[in-house]
Amino acid sequence: MLKNLKDLTLEDMKVKRLTLKKEYMDLRFKTVVGHVENPLKKRELRRDIARLNTIIHEYAIGIRKV
């Protein structure tokens, strides 16, 4: 996943973050209802969202350049 993130533009990262958040919320709902095929997917999504947040924040504070 990390190799793919470095190739994305900042706007693409923001869109990807929104889609991952939506997917994470859907998975959380399915967990509450009681039917999840892969419970580890929730952890993977949460970590991918955190990675994206970190990279987006690095652009915002100037560590990474556009």
From Swiss-Prot:
Q: What Gene3D superfamilies does the database record attribute to this sequence?
A: 1.10.287.310
CDD domains referenced in this protein's UniProt entry, alphabetically: Ribosomal_L29_HIP
Instruction: Keywords in alphabetical order, please.
Output: Ribonucleoprotein, Ribosomal protein
Q: Name one GO biological process term.
A: translation
What domain of life is recorded for the organism? Bacteria
Which GO MF terms does the UniProt record name?
structural constituent of ribosome
Sorted alphabetically, which Pfam families does this protein's record hold?
Answer: Ribosomal_L29
Q: Name one GO cellular component term.
A: ribonucleoprotein complex
Family, as annotated: Belongs to the universal ribosomal protein uL29 family.
NCBIfam families in the cross-refs = L29
**What is the protein named?**
Large ribosomal subunit protein uL29
Q: Which organism is it from?
A: Borrelia recurrentis (strain A1)
